[in-house]
């Protein structure tokens, strides 16, 4: 809201626009004829009439020209229509009204097929001829001619965009322009839920096309326009207006909200009522357009949850376009009923429009049109409000005035239709003791009459019964009810009101009240009682005078000859009287009480709504806090989870040596990668040749783990490179074996071929690019013992791995240990050696031969128990593996906790830094306060010293003056001739002594204290 009021102040620092040259305060009466002059069915101009007379050799023009529809479905029919029209007028010279007789012929399909080509040529030729004859050849016509679109320019059409609002065409009986009605209706039906309406711009090309169509005078269909383009077209219309809100009203509105010093005033009901008065002082057309626009914006704001257009967003988007103070728009939207739905039927109260006269008149017989001094018809043509006070008629004639009545019910109607009157109804009830007695007597008489006339009233029952049913709710207010079977005329004659029957015929004098016994109504008129001319008779009986308005159960208006008299009335309204007052103090007091009650109810409703709004706001704030808390918790959990993953990833990275990482990622040289693959292949050979079940299981687990990890971690390109290197290595091995065939026996060659087949199968499953394929990882089968642990493999050094190969391969004889150790150590040494040296290959072959011999011997020798590798030793080894796994698990937990502790330490450190900064500032503030206090004390002491010095100097001056006066006295006495010399000497001595004493006193006073 601060930005809105800032914008309202900035508007009036700008230069006054050139378009605001009209004085709306005195010329709004001339706009009264806008309902007829600006209608689209207005008469033709002189130029159009002259053009229609010579229509034989010229083109048609004016408002009667056929317009092109925007729908593609009817385009061909309209083209044929225009072409046939021009061909007929150019060759046969028919009248201009001949155009409307061809519609039934254009729908025939045969005629459409025959004339399609001729129609296009005729329409385009006519368009070109029409442009050149009127000298209207611009960019639009060039585009139309290039594209072949038959756009007919109408030079006599009335412009809509960029003209004053009073010149825009409207419908008959309305002051709102047609374009605004169409666009607002389209937006209300289709676009209220569109997000960012009036904020997101539409398509400029489409907006410009529709502007040209509207300015050309065509009946445009706005239903196919998309929401944002329709809103942009409406904004363009308001932006092109010369003046929408006059600057005089804008300045007065700003003065309501901002004082002389430029400060914002607090908004209260007095300011809003003054703003309402200023809004009602707009010209009539501008007022109605503002009412329609704010109604649309209020509906748009009510759906701000979907379209995101709150009151501030609407003000930001539309206030610069409307060029008015934001308060006019914002408060009109938020309090639309307060600003535009009047309690009284008139458009404004009479004091809101001082330049309009005769706004309030006496109640006429028919609705009248309110006229201004300039003769223009205003838009509100309803009779003034009639105020009715109703009640029971008392038994005596003393309480005829409503001054002794009490208000029992009030009715206030405020319809949106301006032509319907608004009625204040104040119902009063008289219930004295005599009245109650009279009612009891009437009930007794009624019971007697029912017994007598039960057979004679069968016909009247059919006519009276429906009337009594319609007003049964009103009859419930009384203390008695009349039987519907009762004969009305007979009952009235038997009542005590027959005494006053002469009032019905004679009546009172002119201007007095006359009581009519028929219906018991009281009428006020300018004639003789109930039968006077131009009188208003309100009640159940109606009136019998000329030009009288009778209001009864069957309300009718009789104009001339007593048309409204002798109404068939309801029994429930027999004892009611209704009086119309124009200037009565009691009626004004009743209206004032009603207004106060309305204000009180509105204030209570406002306070209730404010409490509910505060409650909802409090709940929404709590909800937002809860949402923020949950989002922060989720983010913290996600961050901690990411940190734990990073820690695990780092731990897994540390398990690999740098050389193995290079081999896995393919970053090392070809020799090192081939060397690593060779070592892996040899290890796989040993694992596959071993006949024990445990080693086979280990090899299977090893291969499966490697294949699954390779699919997850490494790309297919690295796998292909490693396979190519393996194939090259196998080819080189085969070539070398061919050279050494003379030294190797045939059995060994067959075994070697089997070995190569096994290596190809195992290496393809492992795929070479395995993160866990090095000798530093030891596969362990812990299916029975360590199933609850997370890790199933352990990190070992090369020496540890080589020493435990015997246990894994199932070697059970002690004499075979040095050979297996040497073979495993030879395998591990292959990491740092080149695989292309023939000596290494020979050593491998020898080691393999020794290993095969050992296996054969093992098969021949029976099983012998080896105490070195018993079950206890194996369990010991398994316990060691479990311990290592537990240690690793503990290390992981410690690392996680450590990161969490580090984070907490960082948070504590940051909070401590903030607290230290705050504490330092607090200490500095305390020091400054102490310093200021000391300075103040010092200044106070200085001020006291200054006061003492001032008093000291004042006393010193006084003493000096006294001393001078005493010396003068002594001198005068010593010089007097009458005194003897002895006395003079004594006085001189006394004077000298006194002067010396005074000097001593002065010296003592000068001594600093």
Swiss-Prot record:
Domain spans labelled Rho-GAP: 163-351
Listed Basic and acidic residues bias regions: 12-23
Extent of Polar residues compositional bias: 58-69, 766-781, 967-980
SUPFAM superfamilies: GTPase activation domain, GAP
Keywords of this entry: Coiled coil, Cytoplasm, GTPase activation
Parts forming coiled coils: 580-656, 715-743, 839-952
Biased composition (Gly residues): 522-546
Biased composition (Low complexity): 26-35, 104-117, 394-415, 432-468, 512-521, 547-557, 695-713, 981-1009
CDD domains recorded: RhoGAP
GO terms of molecular function: GTPase activator activity
Compartmental location: Cytoplasm
Annotated positions for site Arginine finger: 199
Domain of life: Eukaryota
Keyword Electron transport among record annotations: no
One GO biological process term: small GTPase-mediated signal transduction
Ranges of Basic residues composition bias in the record: 89-103
InterPro entries: Rho-GAP, Rho_GTPase_activation_prot, RhoGAP_dom
Residue segments, region Disordered: 1-72, 89-117, 388-420, 432-482, 508-571, 686-713, 759-781, 965-1009
GO cellular component terms attached to this protein's record: cytoplasm; plasma membrane
Biological role: Rho GTPase-activating protein involved in the signal transduction pathway.
Protein name listed in UniProt: Rho GTPase-activating protein gacT
């Amino acid at each position: 809201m601060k930005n809105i009021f800032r914008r309202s102040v900035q508007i009036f620092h700008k230069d006054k626009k050139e378009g605001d040259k009209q004085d709306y305060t005195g010329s709004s009466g001339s706009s009264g004829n806008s309902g007829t002059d600006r209608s689209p069915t207005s008469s033709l101009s002189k130029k159009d009439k002259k053009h229609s007379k010579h229509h034989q050799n010229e083109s048609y023009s004016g408002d009667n020209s056929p317009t092109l529809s925007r729908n593609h479905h009817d385009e061909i029919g309209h083209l044929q229509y225009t072409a046939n029209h021009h061909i007929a007028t150019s060759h046969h010279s028919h009248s201009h009204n001949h155009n409307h007789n061809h519609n039934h012929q254009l729908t025939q399909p045969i005629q459409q097929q025959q004339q399609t080509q001729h129609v296009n040529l005729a329409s385009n030729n006519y368009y070109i001829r029409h442009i050149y004859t009127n000298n209207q050849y611009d960019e639009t016509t060039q585009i139309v001619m290039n594209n072949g679109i038959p756009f007919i320019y109408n030079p006599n059409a009335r412009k809509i965009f960029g003209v004053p609002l009073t010149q825009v065409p409207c419908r008959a009986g309305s002051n709102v322009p047609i374009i605004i009605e169409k666009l607002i209706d389209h937006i209300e039906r289709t676009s209220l839920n569109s997000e960012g309406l009036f904020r997101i711009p539409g398509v400029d090309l489409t907006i410009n096309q529709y502007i040209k169509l509207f300015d050309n005078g065509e009946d445009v269909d706005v239903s196919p326009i998309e929401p944002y383009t329709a809103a942009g077209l409406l904004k363009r219309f308001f932006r092109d207006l010369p003046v929408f809100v006059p600057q005089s009203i804008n300045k007065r509105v700003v003065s309501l909200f901002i004082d002389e010093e430029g400060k914002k005033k607090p908004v209260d009901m007095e300011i809003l009522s003054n703003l309402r008065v200023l809004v009602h002082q707009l010209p009539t057309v501008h007022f109605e357009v503002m009412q329609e626009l704010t109604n649309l914006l209020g509906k748009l704001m009510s759906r701000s949850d979907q379209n995101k257009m709150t009151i501030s967003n609407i003000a930001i988007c539309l206030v610069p376009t409307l060029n008015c103070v934001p308060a006019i728009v914002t408060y009109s939207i938020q309090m639309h009923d307060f600003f535009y739905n009047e309690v009284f039927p008139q458009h404004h109260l009479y004091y809101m429009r001082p330049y309009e006269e005769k706004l309030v008149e006496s109640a006429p017989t028919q609705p009248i049109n309110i006229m201004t001094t300039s003769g223009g018809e205003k838009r509100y043509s309803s009779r003034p409000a009639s105020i009715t006070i109703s009640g029971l008629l008392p038994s005596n004639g003393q309480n005829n005035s409503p001054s002794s009545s009490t208000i029992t019910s009030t009715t206030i109607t405020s319809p949106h239709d301006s032509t319907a009157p608004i009625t204040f109804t104040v119902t009063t009830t008289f219930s004295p003791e005599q009245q109650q007695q009279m009612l009891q007597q009437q009930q007794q008489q009624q019971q007697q009459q029912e017994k007598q006339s039960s057979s004679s009233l069968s016909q009247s029952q059919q006519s009276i019964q429906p009337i009594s049913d319609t007003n049964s709710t009103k009859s419930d207010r009384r203390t008695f009810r009349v039987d519907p079977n009762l004969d009305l005329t007979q009952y009235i004659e038997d009542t005590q009101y027959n005494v006053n029957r002469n009032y019905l015929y004679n009546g009172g004098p002119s201007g007095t009240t006359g009581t009519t016994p028929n219906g018991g109504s009281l009428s006020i008129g300018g004639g003789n009682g109930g039968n006077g001319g131009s009188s208003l008779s309100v009640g159940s009986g109606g009136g019998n005078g000329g030009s009288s308005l009778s209001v009864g159960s069957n309300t009718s208006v009789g104009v001339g000859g007593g048309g409204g008299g002798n109404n068939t009335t309801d029994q429930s309204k027999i004892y009611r009287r209704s009086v119309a007052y124009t200037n009565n103090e009691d009626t004004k007091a009743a209206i004032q009480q009603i207004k106060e009650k309305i204000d009180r109810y509105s204030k209570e409703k406002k306070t209730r709504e404010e409490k509910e709004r505060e409650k909802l706001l409090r709940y929404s704030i709590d909800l937002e806090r809860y949402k923020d808390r949950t989002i922060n918790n989720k983010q913290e959990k996600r961050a901690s989870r990411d940190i734990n993953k990073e820690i695990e990833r780092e731990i897994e990275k540390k398990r690999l040596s740098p050389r193995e990482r290079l081999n896995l990622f393919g970053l090392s040289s070809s020799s090192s990668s081939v060397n690593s693959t060779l070592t892996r292949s040899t290890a796989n050979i040993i694992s596959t040749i071993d006949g024990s079940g445990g080693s086979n299981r280990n090899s299977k687990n090893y291969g499966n783990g490697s294949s699954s990890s390779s699919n997850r971690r490494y790309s297919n390109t690295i796998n292909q490179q490693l396979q190519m290197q393996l194939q090259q290595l196998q080819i080189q091995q085969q070539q070398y074996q061919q050279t050494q065939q003379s030294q190797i026996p045939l059995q060994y060659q067959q075994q070697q071929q089997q070995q190569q087949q096994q290596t190809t199968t195992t290496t393809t499953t492992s795929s070479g690019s395995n993160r866990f394929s090095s000798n530093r990882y030891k596969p362990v089968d812990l299916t029975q013992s360590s199933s609850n642990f997370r890790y199933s493999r352990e990190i070992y050094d090369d020496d540890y791995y080589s020493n435990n190969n015997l246990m894994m391969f199932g070697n059970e004889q002690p004499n075979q240990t040095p050979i297996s150790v040497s073979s495993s150590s030879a395998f591990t040494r292959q990491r740092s050696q080149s695989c292309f040296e023939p000596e290494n290959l020979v050593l491998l072959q020898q080691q393999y031969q020794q290993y095969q011999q050992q296996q054969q011997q093992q098969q021949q020798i029976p099983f012998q128990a080896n105490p070195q590798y018993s079950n206890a030793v194996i369990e010991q080894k398994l316990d060691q593996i479990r311990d290592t796994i537990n240690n690793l698990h503990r290390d992981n937990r410690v690392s996680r906790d450590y990161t969490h502790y580090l984070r907490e330490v960082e948070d504590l450190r940051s909070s401590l830094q903030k607290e230290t900064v705050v504490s330092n500032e607090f200490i500095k503030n305390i020091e400054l306060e102490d310093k200021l206090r000391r300075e103040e004390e010092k200044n106070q002491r200085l001020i006291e010293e200054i006061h003492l010095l001032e008093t000291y100097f004042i006393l010193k001056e006084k003493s000096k003056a006294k001393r001078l006066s005493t010396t003068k006295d002594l001198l005068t006495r010593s010089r007097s001739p009458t005194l003897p010399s002895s006395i003079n000497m004594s006085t001189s001595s006394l004077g000298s002594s006194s002067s010396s004493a005074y000097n001593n006193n002065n010296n003592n006073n000068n001594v600093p204290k």
